[in-house]
Amino acid sequence: MSRQSYIPNILTSVRFVAAPLFFYTFLNDLFLISVSILVLALITDVLDGYIARKLDVTSDMGAYLDVTSDFVLIVVCFLAYVIKGWYDPLILLLIIAMFLLFVATSGLKKPVYDPMGKYLGGYLMLMILVSILFPEFVVRQILFIVLILICLTSVLTRFFFIRRSKELQSL
C-alpha cells in the first residue's frame, strides 16, 4: 500500500483532534482560534472523501471513520455550546438520536450513500460555524428550528423508504 493511500484517513483523523481543541478554545473564549479549527475540520471533511475517490482508496473502514469523526466533532461542538448556554441540552439528544437512527436504518454491514444523512451532517456543520460567527440568540433560534424541520424530514423519509421497501419485498 502506498503512502498516499493513508492521506484520506489522516485527514479524517484531524477531526478527532479538532474536537477537543475546539472545545477548549471555545470555552476559553478564544473564538478566532475556534473558528480556525472549525474551518480546518470542514476542509478535511470535504477533502478526505474526494482524495480517497481520486486515489481509488475508498474503504468501508474509511467511510465509518469519516462518519464517526463527523459525529464526534458535531457532538463535542454542541456540548461546548450547551455548556456556554447557547443551546438547550436537548439538542444533544436530538443529534445523538438522529445518528442512531442513521446507523439503524443504514445497516451495519456496509456503509451506504444516504442523502438525508449527508444533508443533516452538512447542516449541523454549517450550524456550528454560523452559530459562532453570528452568536445572536435569534440566529441560533432560527438555526434550531431549521434543524428540527430537517430532522422531521429525515425521519419521515426513512419511515416511507422502509415501508416502501417492505411493500416491494412482499410482491
Which ranges hold each PLM region?
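A feature for the membrane-embedded catalytic helix bundles of lipid/isoprenoid biosynthetic enzymes
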Residues: 2, 67-171
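Hydrophobic alpha-helical transmembrane segments of integral membrane proteins
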Residues: 4-5, 13-17, 131
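Membrane-embedded alpha-helical segments that form the functional core of polytopic membrane enzymes
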Residues: 10-61, 77-80, 96-101, 140-153
